UniProtKB/Swiss-Prot annotation:
Family: Belongs to the MON1/SAND family.
Residue list for modification N-acetylmethionine: 1
Residue span of region Disordered: 1-106
Protein name according to UniProt: Vacuolar fusion protein MON1 homolog B
């Protein structure tokens, strides 16, 4: 993987011919604005940003009868702590009791609604079902009216508000936003919300439920999942890297230790085991995938991020759990069986995905082998120090300071390598430092997130995509750059000049090149599991028929 450290940054002289534009409703210093360069400093043409056809997953087998919709509500939900009651279907998702005329409700920057085609509410980010029933009725009527004319409603723009609609089978998802997110970015956020719902029930189960009863109240089966959806939407506001870049973030770790942990996962296998993941603080340590299961289908980063968010639920703070989970991008109609455990009272989490429903004890034995191996490697102590936990599970997620780069004037950045030689072996990843002053407060983090979203939308504009954007704002200077090797967003001090920004970015690229073995997983390990028992378990093989 090339980090782009040897790539020459654009020279200051070439920046004088930049086109001057300005973000809407954004104050800038005199002589500032946005400078966009639709040219590649390396002389390369712009790569296509459209989605490509992905390999088709193996043919799934339907979930066992015990996982039919009628019994799914009895499955333990990691989104709801065991010592707290789940919210009733009539309760508010966001804890805000108001309607569109309520000032507190109107003050929210973004609202997300999920409802059925019949107008039955499923999830609300803020407000109560009773107060917003009329609003959701209007949404359903709008969609039905446009569909009756043989068309599909995608978005509505009204002054500084956007309404984005997404129809996914029998579910209607709507985002109402006054943030700087583009319609495409809001649609991606709605897809992530839909994926979270599908991960609990599967797409086939949702379709079967509403085919049987159109006005079914799906909240009964999703009780407790509202908190997971809330956390997902909060992360977009304050830490947008994963969803914005379509990648996962790794824990910075010395390559020898990461390779040793990968080899440990490769050795500790069980029949039907498809994927092993070590994570801490919602970030990936390493992962190993079974050769036969995932050899022809790359694990999508959206699915992996969903798993990382899932195991970050408060209910996984201690002990172990066994529950079915669906990976929507891999196969939206089937279940894996997930074993989740915290290791040695540490925040390190082990996730084992298998295809056999009765494999809990085999997975638990595998966990003990992993735990013993990590102690032998001294990994527990190293991970605890890297995360800054000191056995305190309430501490923040593992990260590094932007000061480690050694580039004065650099406040924050998002970096995603794009030179991935083998998409079946390499996970899309990104790295970013911890948000520090002046972005310690929530409103400042939201403002930085808005700036990143604006830059991303300009770089990936379908009508006029850009290569380089230099933006001088009121409180910071930003530079966004995409090449064939990387995608980079940097936030700099407002006092940094154009020439100074180029020097900072050059130093940052050299640092990433030097540290890439520590920041990224170069080649996720693969392994072959022991053969599955030849008993009657073939009919209960979970997701796959050929194992």
């Amino acid at each position: 993987m090339e980090a782009g450290g040897d790539t020459a940054a654009p020279v200051p002289g070439g920046a004088e011919d930049l086109e001057d534009t300005q973000f809407p409703s954004e104050e800038t210093r005199e002589g500032g604005g946005v400078h966009a360069v639709p040219l590649d400093p390396e002389g390369e043409g712009l790569e296509e940003t459209g989605s490509k056809d992905k390999d088709q997953p193996p043919s799934p087998s339907p979930p066992p009868q015990s996982e039919a919709p009628s019994s799914t509500s009895r499955l333990w939900s990691p989104a709801a702590p065991e010592n707290s009651p789940t919210r009733s279907p009539e309760s508010s998702s966001g804890g805000q009791g108001g309607d569109p005329s309520d000032e507190e409700w109107r003050s929210q920057r973004k609202h997300v609604f999920v409802l059925s085609e019949a107008g039955k509410p499923i999830y609300l980010r803020y407000g109560s079902v009773e107060a917003l029933s009329a609003t959701m009725g209007v949404m359903t009527a709008l969609v039905s009216f446009v569909q009756s004319a043989g068309d599909t409603i995608r978005a509505i723009y009204a002054e500084d508000h956007k309404l984005v609609f997404l129809q996914q089978g029998p579910l209607l998802l709507v985002a109402m936003s006054r943030t700087s997110q583009s319609a495409a970015q809001l649609r991606g956020e709605l897809l992530a919300v839909h994926a979270q719902i599908v991960s609990t029930l599967t797409r086939a189960s949702v379709a079967r439920i509403f085919a049987h009863k159109q006005n079914y109240d799906l909240r009964r089966l999703l009780a407790g999942s509202e908190r997971t959806l809330d956390r997902l939407l909060d992360s977009v506001e304050q830490d947008p890297g994963a969803l914005l870049l379509g990648a996962v973030r790794c824990v910075p770790l010395a390559r020898p230790l990461r390779d040793a942990l990968g080899a440990l996962l490769r050795r500790c296998t069980a029949p039907g085991l498809a994927l092993s993941v070590l994570a801490v603080g919602g970030r990936l340590i390493t992962a190993a995938q079974e050769r036969n299961v995932l050899a022809e289908c790359r694990l999508d980063p959206a699915d992996l991020q969903l798993l990382l968010d899932w195991v970050g639920a408060p209910a996984f703070a201690a002990g172990e759990a066994w529950a079915p989970v669906c990976l929507p991008r891999f196969n939206p109609d089937g279940f894996f069986y997930a074993y989740v455990a915290r290791l040695d009272a540490m925040p390190v989490c082990l996730l084992l995905l298998g295809t056999q429903r009765e494999a809990f004890h085999a997975m638990a034995a595998c966990r003990r082998l992993v735990e013993d191996g990590m102690h032998a490697l001294g990994a527990m102590r190293v991970l605890g120090e890297a995360a800054g936990f000191s056995n305190a599970s309430s501490a923040s997620a593992p990260a590094y300071s932007v000061q480690a780069v050694g580039a004065p004037g650099l406040r924050h950045f998002l970096y995603k390598p794009l030179d991935i030689p083998d998409h079946h072996r390499q996970l899309p990843q990104f790295t970013s430092p911890e948000l520090e002053a002046p972005y310690s407060r929530e409103e400042e983090r939201q403002r930085l997130s808005d700036l990143y979203h604006r830059l991303h939308a300009r770089l990936h504009n379908t009508s006029r995509p850009l290569r380089l954007i230099y933006h001088v704002a009121e409180k910071e200077t930003l530079l966004a750059w995409v090449t064939s090797k990387f995608e980079l967003y940097t936030c700099l001090s407002p006092l940094v000049t154009k020439a100074g920004a180029i020097l900072v970015v050059t130093k940052l690229l050299r640092w990433v090149k030097k540290e890439e073995d520590r920041l990224f997983i170069r080649y996720p390990p693969k392994y072959s599991t022991p053969p599955a028992p030849s008993t009657d378990q073939a009919a209960h093989n979970g997701l796959f028929t050929g194992l």
